[in-house]
């Protein structure tokens, strides 16, 4: 009898001792809604706190700089080529002005200072007509030196533009960040400001 009662007792309590008990299955769904049934005010406050913890510098670090992959940057060869082309255009312009002055010797007096500036002052023994702009001039810089000067000027200009861009971007990000924080605070106060405080919130 004792053995029979013992066996019967174990069979009766078998569902309770099993890991997959029906009572545990009934209680399991209740814990999930309880954790998910938090107050919307707490969720909104947590979102506002996480947003307040961020800063415009964080978004600036996440976004890659638009100056990183600039494909239109001039190389040294392109700078030298542009200088050569500009020098050729200047020579052609001077040649045309010299031929125009030779073809029309009776030019007006107002065009003479312009020719004087281009060709330079005439020597005491020669007249202004004989001092041609095509005269051999001694250059102050070589082509390589001019290219280096232009490259340095372009680099300085690029750095200045980059600094101005970063400053403007930081200012705009700070303004957007302040507007977002103010909007979130206004929404929280409008939705939950007049409600009485409870243990849930």
UniProtKB/Swiss-Prot annotation:
**Domain of life the protein comes from:** Eukaryota
- SS bond list: none
Offer a single GO CC term for the protein.
cytoplasm
What keywords would UniProt list here?
A: Adaptive immunity, Cytoplasm, Developmental protein, Immunity, Innate immunity, Membrane, Nucleus, Phosphoprotein, Protein transport, Repressor, Transcription, Transcription regulation, Transport, Ubl conjugation
Q: Write down the InterPro entries for this protein, in alphabetical order.
A: Akirin (IPR024132)
Q: Name one GO molecular function term.
A: enzyme binding
Q: Name one GO biological process term.
A: positive regulation of innate immune response
At what positions is Phosphoserine found? 18, 21, 55
Per the Swiss-Prot or TrEMBL annotation, the motif Nuclear localization signal is positioned at: 23-28
Q: Coiled coil where?
A: none
Could you describe the post-translational modifications of this protein?
Answer: Polyubiquitinated. Polyubiquitination is dependent of UBR5 that extends pre-ubiquitinated AKIRIN2.
Could you tell me where this protein is found in the cell? Answer: Nucleus; Cytoplasm; Membrane
Against CDD domains, the record matches this protein to: akirin-2
Motif SYVS motif located where? 198-201
Effects seen without this gene? Mice are embryonic lethal. Null mutant embryos could not be detected even on embryonic day 9.5. Conditional deletion in macrophages impairs proinflammatory cytokine production in response to Listeria infection and clearance of infecting bacteria. Conditional deletion in B-cells causes a decrease in the splenic B-cell numbers, leading to severe proliferation and activation defects in B-cells. The B-cell viability is also impaired, leading to decreased immune responses to T-dependent and T-independent antigens.
Subunit record text:
Homodimer. Interacts with IPO9; the interaction is direct. Associates with 20S and 26S proteasomes. Interacts with SMARCD1; promoting SWI/SNF complex recruitment. Interacts with NFKBIZ. Interacts with YWHAB.
Q: Which family does it belong to?
A: Belongs to the akirin family.
Reported function: Molecular adapter that acts as a bridge between a variety of multiprotein complexes, and which is involved in embryonic development, immunity, myogenesis and brain development. Plays a key role in nuclear protein degradation by promoting import of proteasomes into the nucleus: directly binds to fully assembled 20S proteasomes at one end and to nuclear import receptor IPO9 at the other end, bridging them together and mediating the import of pre-assembled proteasome complexes through the nuclear pore.
Question: What does the record's miscellaneous section state?
Answer: 'Akiraka ni suru' means 'making things clear' in Japanese. The name is given based on the presence of the clear nuclear localization signal.
Put simply, this protein is called: Akirin-2
Query: Encoded by which gene?
Result: Akirin2
């Amino acid at each position: 009898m004792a053995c029979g009662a013992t066996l019967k007792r174990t069979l009766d309590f078998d569902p309770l001792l099993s890991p997959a008990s029906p009572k545990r299955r009934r209680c399991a769904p209740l814990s999930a809604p309880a954790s998910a049934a938090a107050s919307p005010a707490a969720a909104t406050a947590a979102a506002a706190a996480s947003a307040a913890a961020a800063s415009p510098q964080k978004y600036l670090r996440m976004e890659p700089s638009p100056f990183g992959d600039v494909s239109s940057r001039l190389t040294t060869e392109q700078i030298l080529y542009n200088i050569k082309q500009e020098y050729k255009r200047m020579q052609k312009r001077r040649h045309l002005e010299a031929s125009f002055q030779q073809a029309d010797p009776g030019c007006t007096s107002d065009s003479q200072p312009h020719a004087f500036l281009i060709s330079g002052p005439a020597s005491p023994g020669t007249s202004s007509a004989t001092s041609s702009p095509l005269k051999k001039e001694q250059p102050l810089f070589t082509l390589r030196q001019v290219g280096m000067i232009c490259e340095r000027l372009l680099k300085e200009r690029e750095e200045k533009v980059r600094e101005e861009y970063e400053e403007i971007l930081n200012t705009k990000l700070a303004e957007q960040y302040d507007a977002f924080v103010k909007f979130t605070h206004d929404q929280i106060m409008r939705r939950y400001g007049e409600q009485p405080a409870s243990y849930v919130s």
